[in-house]
Amino acid sequence: MSRNRIRTAVLATATITALTLTGCGGKQDRTSDTAATGASGGANDCTASAGQITIATGNSTGVYYALGGGLAQVISANTELKATAAETGASVQNIQQLVDKKYDIAFSLADTAADAVTGKGAFEGKTADVKALARIYSNYTQVVVSKKSGITKVEDFKGKRISTGSPKSGTEVIANRLIQAAGLDPAKDVSAQRLDLTKTVDAMKDGSIDGLVWSGGLPTGGITDLMTAMKDDVQFVDITPLLPKLKDVNPVYAEDVIPAATYGTPADAKTVVVPNVLLVRSDMSDANACALTKLIFDKKADLEKVHPAAKDLDPATAKESDPVELHPGSKKALDDLG
């Protein structure tokens, strides 16, 4: 992500509420209708069927929630499908509830999705029958600590109160992997607080926790709030020394920087990134998967108005979802897009 794009983030983020309210249905618990699986023409069709479709997103102050609401609006406005987006705990929970047919589309970190299809981590012993619509933008692992905590590296988490994200979230997955890579036991060495982002930010402000791990796009509204409120009292932690150990677990992890302009910090912050993917069940019709995938890229400009992370949507990298297989309908759409 370029620095110039980051500098426009605050203005772009200001449009989130206006563009997503009609698409966000709050927390939901429903059984998926036939829209996701229903046929819509022949094998070469790329037209969505009529019906209802729901999208599992993430915490209300995170990028999944913002883009999920925008995606729901785009789907409803341009197809016969009526889409809603729901606030959730994010990646692990999203995949579990996608498989249980409570949602039809799910945002997920690529490392969590890889665990799901290979039966590892939270999915030990039971693989999830899901496919990818596309690889989308990348999540930045944002480790923020109070300066008075004395934390300068993940090894310093020992004995500290650290928010590791919502239960069953992708943030919790990578937080625990970071702690383990630092030679610590998440259950014994760290006072892990399993908080959503809103509660995490509040806890940082009132001093009831020493630091946080968050995995999200740039900028994340909750982190912007924290940095604006606490300014020089907080700082990012460089986690890149742990990257080799993380890559031993999953090669999807890579190094990048959080540009200083993102949150108004004194300097760029080195960190670890992981791609995001949009997932569906394998039983989604080829026509629906094709139509939805094509729509994401055709309406990229509309999604950019919701959140600048959508600027990273690229058909050239969208197929890179291994080990999660692309849905056949999505493959057709991406082949057509070139």
Regions found by a protein language model. Give the residues of each.
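Bilobed "Venus flytrap"/periplasmic-binding protein-like clamshell domains
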Residues: A50-N78, K82-A83, S138-D206, A316, ...
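Pocket-lining segment of extracytoplasmic ligand-binding domains
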Residues: A110-T112, G119-F123, S149, P186-L278
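Segments of small-molecule ligand-sensing domains
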Residues: A269-T271, P275-G338
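Bacterial N-terminal signal peptides that target proteins for export
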Residues: M1-L11
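N-terminal low-complexity, Pro/Thr/Ser-rich intrinsically disordered segments
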Residues: T34-A56
